[in-house]
Swiss-Prot record:
Catalytically driven reaction(s): nitrate + a quinol = a quinone + nitrite + H2O
EC number(s) from the headed UniProt entry: 1.7.5.1
Organism: Synechocystis sp. (strain ATCC 27184 / PCC 6803 / Kazusa)
Pathway: Nitrogen metabolism; nitrate reduction (denitrification); dinitrogen from nitrate: step 1/4
Family, similarity comment: Belongs to the prokaryotic molybdopterin-containing oxidoreductase family. NasA/NapA/NarB subfamily.
Taxonomic superkingdom: Bacteria
PROSITE patterns noted in UniProt: 4FE4S_MOW_BIS_MGD, MOLYBDOPTERIN_PROK_1
Limits of the 4Fe-4S Mo/W bis-MGD-type domain: 7-70
Note on cofactor: Binds 1 [4Fe-4S] cluster.
Gene (UniProt): narB
Alphabetized GO MF terms: 4 iron, 4 sulfur cluster binding; electron transfer activity; formate dehydrogenase (quinone) activity; metal ion binding; molybdopterin cofactor binding; nitrate reductase (quinone) activity
Protein name (Swiss-Prot/TrEMBL): Nitrate reductase
Amino acid sequence: MDSPAILPTTRTLCPYCGVGCGLEAVASPQKSVVDAGHAHKIRGDRQHPSSQGMVCVKGATVMESMDKQRLLYPMFRSSLDQPWQQISWEAALEIVVDKIQQVKQTLGVSGLCMYASGQMQTEDYYVAQKLFKGCLGTNNFDTNSRLCMSSAVSAYSLSFGSDGPPCCYEDLEITDCAFLIGTNTADCHPIIFNRLRKHHKQNPHVKLIVVDPRCTATAEVADLHLAINPGSDITLLHGIAYLLKKWNLIDQKFIDNHTQDFEQYCQVIDHYPPEKVTQICGISLEQLETAAHYWGNAKTVLSLWSMGMNQSFQGTAKGRCLINLHLLTGQIGKPGSGPFSLTGQPNAMGGREAGGLSHLLPGYRSIKNPQHRQEVEQLWQISPGRINPEPGLSAWEMFMGLENQQVGFLWIVATNPVVSMPDLERVKKALQQSTFTIHQDAYSPTETAEYAHLLLPAAQWSEKTGTMTNSERRVTLSPAFRSPPGEARPDWEIFAEVGRRLGFENQFNFVDSAAVHREYVQLTAERLCDQSGVSYEKLQKLGPLQWPCRQSDQESQLLSTKRLYTDYKFCTENGRANFCLDHSRGLAEPVDPNYPFVLTNGRLYGHWHTQTRTGHIEKIKKMHPKPILEMHPKDAEKLGIKSQDLVAIKSRRGSAQLEVLVTRAIAPGTVFMPMHWGFLWDDNAEVNSLTHATACPISKQPELKACAVNITPV
């Protein structure tokens, strides 16, 4: 295990969102640096290029959650109705290995699954890929990034030939027009928003467009807020393209030299004249034309998007149709411009680079590509053909595998699917049928632990050393500066020990996380996400580094890689970017007389995911003491409801009960509910008991952002 450094101040990375803010953990002079969490104070790292010393309430209070309700020892029970028993690590590892061997004999390796998390460090991801996809020969490794970022991955891949956001945070401060769609950046990525908002306030010519059915803190400061109807994103984007083409506000030279399928794209957008678009989207002609003018007349345009676009059964198409506007106007590969997807979790980017979805391999490689498989097999020193050529199960498919008895072993790591998965009642029933479920986490109790047979205590941020990559492709070293409590271990060490016990000693002979990292970056060499020039030593000396960062680069070059595609050469076979030709299909579950409201959901400023950390922080609990349903006054009046009334919300799958907040911040016909409450925090406020699992056929990301509900007073 990596020992915590004995330093008065440790530069590290915030473990919450994908902004990747730099933090400084300052040890109390009265106490050892390896004492409990309250011996350290957190402040923003002014030298970190992504955050420049800024920190939000989550990062500022993170130490308050480090020692509350931690899982300290391995715990086991043979069935869900049995009490937990503390066991040794030796016994726990024996159980894991025995169960893997049993399932291999009964169901084959396709019956083995791991469902992990963007909370893991890149080293954790990498060792898990090697264990499952390499040594065990199953691609059934997926993560909660499937629920947040997989549509962005497939959008970039299909449009540009590779995943990877082409922009950087500096672009926030030099763009002439920022187009935000499907992102409440002020609440969900606050430090990014602070940088953009400062630029916007100081430069009157800069335009800020926000597309969101809610009037969020982000929308409140916009020059133009387009409160479109849920599900009409593609219609809006095609409508803007229609006007840009009509007004000749396009870059024909860029289109001719660097894109393909433009003529077919023109045929698509011809179906989206303004009168049709305004009716479907629920906006005025003036608003639509203003948006197109802002985009078309700006010297540089930067678009930002997140879960509001990705969490859709057309999530890939939505991302690609936004990219279309950049291709149409040549707004990519230059300062202040480009399509910028904002990652949700601190290492969702690093996970993608390490192959952390069931169709990927490390280094932005594809499972389906035989050359990619061969390259990975050679480095891993496993037999040719060991890596299965077919993608593994996605997150939802894993739980359905439990339901139909095709999955006999589910290893859940650093995530809480009994709160975060759609159609929760079905997920819970599937877990009740599981023959063996592991929950490897830093905290207990969690909602998912209620459905597990084995609990493995994990070291978390501050207790293990590793790297994470933020939304602007910047890799930061996150060193251990405290000792893990109890018998908690780093995730990668647990995976490696299981691998050794399965007979793969040579593949898992890592002495520390730096050794894992050295092997991992070899698989990124000469790939778009090249990190062969990144090492722990360079990160300690130079600070965070953006990729591509090649081994051959001089030190001065390592600090200058800001944007991708500056030469307009894309990663497709012919080097041209692809226009998306998809039409809008609306919502997967439209409203009807029985379910007349669209329920959307999202984050609150203070909370994070399912509250395993933030639910223990008093300041944040006071900010957000309970979940509330937002409803427009017109809808409330029709139902005879006023603020603070209790209502029942029902979908075709489940129900919840919440207090109402009557507000004009939400559009008529749409209601909003926060996503953070599981049954341990409120016994009747699970938003995902209402949502459905219909997913984008390309990214397999569920449409978590919209479902049809009815509402009645209680």
